[in-house]
């Protein structure tokens, strides 16, 4: 790396100083202050604040910065509630599915088939399932269906999907979650939409549901299905079914927490649906 010419005026022996200091200088978007050889350098961050960092501190600073850059690579974060523009950017950068294509659409199968699928377990996927009675009657079913179509099941303080997002095969969208301080944007794509309409027979069942697969940039790899069902006994059930595994360093080390959050979401999501039926 070439030593900047303007630095020679401050220290004739500067070319023998550690290269890490030069790296740090080039990475800072601000004005250079002055050197205090041989232990520290001073520079402006922005245009106001003066910072003095020793060579050893500079090394730690760079190592920490590289570590943060590594663990946040391809994670879509926002300190404020994500705007439509941020969500669109997340979707545009997300690319393709991040889980095995042989499992695409697998959540459309009955729950029993998913739980008995040894291949899923062998490939490291864990299953999350919740089925809750939310009422009875065709009117309740229709209200539940409308709630899903308008993403009311994501109408939470800490989680949301743009309610204008159409539920159709191939549609990409973001699930926005607030985790501690930042919001995290999770890109997904609808892989199927299934609806069984009620026949003229009074006791016939009806159901509506859709499944979404995770895209690159999502902390997990897998698929999730949301559905509402009117059974033969005229009872209405809301169901969440997913299989997933960590797709990033952060979700890997915090997977027990992720699993708890999945169960918590299922509970909160059910309450959100109940408000609309």
Feature-to-residue mapping (PLM):
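N-terminal mitochondrial targeting presequence
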Residues: 46-49, 55
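Hydrophobic ligand-binding cavity/cleft-lining segments
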Residues: 2-33, 54-180
